[in-house]
Amino acid sequence: MNKWVQNVVSKWKTEGVKINNGTSLGDIEALESVLDFKFPDDFKDFYLAIDGFKDLDWQEHMFYFWPLEKIIEEFNESLDKNFIGFCDFLLASHYIGFKKNQTGIFKMYSISDRAEDNSIAQTFEEVVGMINSRSDLIY
């Protein structure tokens, strides 16, 4: 397991977050095929270690990292087919995810809306750190 992922998982386990077991590379690649999108390596490292949180659980700042199954569910419900979410704040107050046509990590405030134009982070690893440190940019 990648060191940064190991540190994040350890932190969440200490906090009592209910974490799913990791997924397989095959499942990630199948999702990439369905979404017509290639996830970055840091995202893959994370999901190989944990497939999001269980039972809508969230970490201390109320962010819920989705299992792969929920990523596709939310994508199918969203009107913005350029946005691929992977977590939400306070049970869908807003979403954090990728854009298919732009590098970085973005926010979207409603599944009936479009993601913001400006990225809040450059990498998945960076945004996980921002979420865990409660950066103002994630709200």
Where are these regions (language model features)?
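Compact, glycine/acidic-enriched structural inserts
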Residues: 117-133
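Residues at the C-termini of beta-strands that transition into short coil/loop
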Residues: 87, 112, 131
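Segments surrounding the PLD/"HKD" phosphodiesterase catalytic module and close analogs
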Residues: 53, 94-122
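A surface-exposed partner-binding patch
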Residues: 1-100, 138-139
